[in-house]
Amino acid sequence: MRRVITIFIVLVINLVLQSTVLQYIRINSIIPNTALIIIISMSLLRGRVEGSVTGFGAGILQDIFFGSSLGYYALLGTLVGYFAGRFNHNYYRENYALPVFLCFIGAVIYESVVFVTGAFFNGYLNYIYFLINIILPEAVYTAIAAVIIYRILFSVNDRIEKSEKHKRRLFSIK
């Protein structure tokens, strides 16, 4: 229960920061996708299920506050969490290369899907322009921010795991 509450608090703080403070560190009107970083980080640290749930939670918050339709970002976040969680067992947690790389690739795919679905409904199809001027710069910015945010989430996860391990030891029958 502690883990769920902690992740919910992290997602709410992210929502507030993304809509306030991060607006002041824009570069050419681009901000890092911190929700995506949280989803991928939690997926790598905890696996597919918790990554999917985190993705759904982050996405539903984005849908409620920023989206035009309920469920779109929730579905995207869930899928990102699931696929990033598949790498959970295949890497050394203290190595930042995989989270940064997945955040870069994830941002490119995520924003491409957002563009393609938006283009489908709006009829705007200049993908190359969008890729060069928005998707790739945002992916780079997201990857850079991932170094800091992953470290924070890593230590939060580590504290929760130690607390859970301690509780299991207290209540185990010998």
Whereabouts are the PLM-identified features?
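Terminal, non-globular segments
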Residues: M1-K174
